[in-house]
Amino acid sequence: MGHKVVVFDISVIRALWETRVKKHKAWQKKEVERLEKSALEKIKEEWNFVAECRRKGIPQAVYCKNGFIDTSVRLLDKIERNTLTRQSSLPKDRGKRSSAFVFELSGEHWTELPDSLKEQTHLREWYISNTLIQIIPTYIQLFQAMRILDLPKNQISHLPAEIGCLKNLKELNVGFNYLKSIPPELGDCENLERLDCSGNLELMELPFELSNLKQVTFVDISANKFSSVPICVLRMSNLQWLDISSNNLTDLPQDIDRLEELQSFLLYKNKLTYLPYSMLNLKKLTLLVVSGDHLVELPTALCDSSTPLKFVSLMDNPIDNAQCEDGNEIMESERDRQHFDKEVMKAYIEDLKERESVPSYTTKVSFSLQL
């Protein structure tokens, strides 16, 4: 006996499938609307916009008002046109005069500095980033007019002692490299004002000789392996900004109030259980960012709304990422994550500065997904 075929009215079957199709289309429409309204989509849009503005050198204050970002394309075009107009109105020889004293290098095809550089000892500023350069040559001591050494995101594993010969150096940025130590001779750069050693991951201490740097106002040693605030940092009497986040701190020194000029103190992503009462003596402190996961004791006056201090306690809830088998890949992934975290916090802190008050609490959630 063959298969028994039951024939229904075809119009009934068609109506059934048309209903299913309509429901599916309605679901698709709702899903599109949900994604458009999704916070993740909004975050993605805003961060892409912020990245584009930063790439074009547009100040945050222009596109961020009261904590909200205007992501309209018209605004971006308008800002870009105004920027180009201002640039075109500048004297034509201004850029040429400045570039004659500036050296710039970027790109992974660079594994060492060009030989011709040693002949250009008149240079005052170096901007070298995203290269595979591992060594800064000793002939750097010849650049006596050097003011700025901006060397982030390379593969520098060693700084020569000769860097101490740069008596006019004001800014040193060696963030997100592979440094495990800083030469004591850097303490001879008595005019240094900014020091950024963030994101080297393996850096554990700073030499005591850096105590001589009395003009330093900015120190960033975040994303390393410091177990305590370096003694030399406590002796930088003009320090205004200290970022020691993402390290291994479990406590702060009782004499932290030596930093009388300190205005911004970033301590989040450590394992601090308490804050010393000497923190109350930092009369100029206006921003304090900590991780509240382990914090159980702190001076209540720090949270007093009548003070100008903005106290931010982050609750960090990381989602474990899948571990790579290759140790180098793990290290690179950690370096990239730390860099991204810093960019997020930088934008958040810039926004905080424009607010009259901070949220009563903030939860920072780390996650990894494809947007």
Swiss-Prot record:
The gene is LRRC2. The lineage of its organism: Eukaryota, Metazoa, Chordata, Craniata, Vertebrata. The keyword Repeat applies. The keyword Cell wall biogenesis/degradation does not apply. Keywords: Leucine-rich repeat, Repeat. It holds the Pfam family LRR_8. One of its GO terms (biological process) is intracellular signal transduction. Disulfide bonds: none annotated. LRR repeats lie at residues 122-143, 145-166, 168-189, 191-214, 215-235, 238-260, 261-283, 284-305, 308-329. It comes from the Eukaryota. This is Leucine-rich repeat-containing protein 2.
